[in-house]
Amino acid sequence: MDVYEAVTSRRAVRGFTDQPVPREVLERVLTAAAWSPSGSNIQPWNTYVVTGAPLAELKKLAVERVATGVPWDEREYEMYPPAMKSPYRERRSAFGKERYGALGIAREDWEARQRAAIANWDCFGAPAALFVYIDRDLGPAQWADLGMYLQTVMLLLRAEGLHSLSLIHI
């Protein structure tokens, strides 16, 4: 698969099979992704791969915690600006309508929307999860580096015939 096909066929998948991702595929992807650009080549990302029983346990604990309604630690930043401007607000709204509509969930069905949201913490059934972090003392330029790294990882996964989804929090 060439890079154009990888880019245009990449989708944010929210439903995975339980078929394991071979270790050699993950190693190949992460080895190549290490070539991602970063300012002054500091490569600020740290990647942890979790699969198998440890991932199953982590997902189970996360889903149980979310289901209790007990909040996680306070967020260090807002996911979206409180007063998001046009056209971004409309795009986000359209995505929500499309997603919940495809799941047959009405806007006013808060319980069903919450159940659908909990699937985030199960990683939508993915058999592998990559947790990627940067040092919290780094700044916006390193967040951009991280974004380039994540895009590279997702395109390399696509080139391997796999789909992926980036989650901001779990």
Regions found by a protein language model. Name each.
Residues 155-159:
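Short hydrophobic alpha-helices that are characteristic scaffold elements of the AMP-binding
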Residues 33:
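Covalent nucleotidyltransferase
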Residues 1-27, 43:
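Specificity-determining recognition surfaces
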Residues 163:
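Residue-level detector of anion-binding/catalytic polar loops
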Residues 40-51:
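Short loop-to-beta-strand entry elements in the cores of soluble alpha/beta enzymes
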Residues 169-170:
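Conserved small/polar residues in nucleotide/adenosyl-binding loops
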Residues 49-139:
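Glycine/small-residue-rich phosphate/adenosyl-binding loop
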Residues 141-145:
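A short secondary-structure junction signal
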